[in-house]
Amino acid sequence: MAAATNPVSAISAYRQLLRATRIAFNGDFPVLHAARAEARKQFDQSRQPGVDTPMKIQHALETAHILRSNIVQGTKIETKEEGGEQVDRYALRIHEYTERGDNDTIKAAGQKPVKVGKGCCSS
């Protein structure tokens, strides 16, 4: 029964991966093409269901999530000379799915007292 659901899950994971590449690499055709070719190659190598099929599907889903939420591309918009050095300016393509962290955890971490001479887990 599980083998019958794996092809549907694999197709779904493949489609999610293709959508994630389109979001992450929109406007950069060579990289988009290379990412999609690699995804196809990996799925073609795993065409026959096996013991590790669920792990490979999970890997594809996690890869799609990382591509969608953590990849930001930059394009060079100008090069200027400032102070005798070449300075490049880039525009970042941040989209609606890009994960934006907040600094609340970093700010809160600085408020804890530091224990000197004790391990991290000792009282």
From Swiss-Prot:
GO terms for cellular component: mitochondrial matrix. Signal peptide: none annotated. GO terms for biological process: mitochondrial respiratory chain complex III assembly. Coiled coil: none annotated. Residues 104-123 are annotated as: Disordered. Belongs to the complex I LYR family. MZM1 subfamily. Assembly factor required for Rieske Fe-S protein RIP1 incorporation into the cytochrome b-c1 (CIII) complex. Functions as a chaperone, binding to this subunit within the mitochondrial matrix and stabilizing it prior to its translocation and insertion into the late CIII dimeric intermediate within the mitochondrial inner membrane. Modulates the mitochondrial matrix zinc pool. Interacts with RIP1. This is Mitochondrial zinc maintenance protein 1, mitochondrial. It comes from Arthroderma otae (strain ATCC MYA-4605 / CBS 113480). The lineage of its organism: Eukaryota, Fungi, Dikarya, Ascomycota, Pezizomycotina.
